[in-house]
Amino acid sequence: MGSLSTANVEFCLDVFKELNSNNIGDNIFFSSLSLLYALSMVLLGARGETEEQLEKVLHFSHTVDSLKPGFKDSPKCSQAGRIHSEFGVEFSQINQPDSNCTLSIANRLYGTKTMAFHQQYLSCSEKWYQARLQTVDFEQSTEETRKTINAWVENKTNGKVANLFGKSTIDPSSVMVLVNAIYFKGQWQNKFQVRETVKSPFQLSEGKNVTVEMMYQIGTFKLAFVKEPQMQVLELPYVNNKLSMIILLPVGIANLKQIEKQLNSGTFHEWTSSSNMMEREVEVHLPRFKLETKYELNSLLKSLGVTDLFNQVKADLSGMSPTKGLYLSKAIHKSYLDVSEEGTEAAAATGDSIAVKSLPMRAQFKANHPFLFFIRHTHTNTILFCGKLASP
């Protein structure tokens, strides 16, 4: 994996583990890529301790050159170090239009009209993240501004992410709101037939079941059996193989905790590596499900180590604006996912631990109990979405 995709996986799993520990027994769903883009745009203008905290949490500090000092006065975006230009390339690869798959990532900065932003910051964020600044009046038109931002997000996510900022969540004293929206709708390479979908039990925990709409098909898919912790790993590609859903299904409910405990960038890469997965005929049972989640990220990011950014006194965003006291007052992440027969609508140990030999002719993959899933960009190995289905 390249340095950027490694950082993407590490950050994704850090966020997952933090959300998982704070939402025990709940469904989890978020876009790690969306968060990474948004925080990288902040990093572009961060300096000092704020910059160091962000680089560490995003796992950039050991993978690429950090931002060079003097960026705010420099005439070229190339002065800002390699990470953002790498992002620019990745962004264009992932954001390519495709008639069979809708994937749109949209970034925008909302700044108070009284705030001066460095022109260099604005031009570089537009070049690499296609993020434009829109000036608004937080102080005098707070409610109107909130509606403006929500309407933009709703439009960019095809109406799936509505009311991102609820009433009273934007303060009149706000000076900057950074918004990142991501929307995905993909068709399966091998669609499930609606006539094959049946009502079936889904085991939530020992002795507790719910009835779900269980989709079914027999097809040729990449599958791996992991011995420790015991699980099946299935890859369901979307049309054109640009993206795929990776499902980590524990053998029995008890193994889920072990998978979560051992999950890191190394084990994820090992478990989901194409060299460890064998193409074979598989009977797939997968529940139809929809997830809609909303997370306040302030406390989550603070617990990961980004503390100064949310502190008006300590935050150093001098690469973004010469104005003192600029900080991020609120970070909210809302996601939507719909998995159906057609496809998905949404807004990765030693070689011995993976068994790829002596498999039965046809394998069964029965997702009738909680599992983890990831939507991944095949070419770059970038994780776009990450989740846990605890209860459909």
Curated annotation (Swiss-Prot):
CDD domains: serpinB11_epipin. Keywords: Cytoplasm, Protease inhibitor, Serine protease inhibitor. Its main location: cytoplasm. Changing W188R: In allele SERPINB11a, allele SERPINB11b and allele SERPINB11c. The record marks K357, S358 as: Reactive bond. SUPFAM superfamilies: Serpins (SSF56574). It comes from the Eukaryota. Residues 341-365 are annotated as: RCL. It is found in: Cytoplasm. Detected in a restricted number of tissues, including lung, placenta, prostate, and tonsil. Pfam families: Serpin. One of its GO terms (molecular function) is serine-type endopeptidase inhibitor activity. GO terms for cellular component: cytoplasm; extracellular space. Belongs to the serpin family. Ov-serpin subfamily. PANTHER family: SERINE PROTEASE INHIBITOR, SERPIN, SERPIN B11. Has no serine protease inhibitory activity, probably due to variants in the scaffold impairing conformational change. This is Serpin B11.
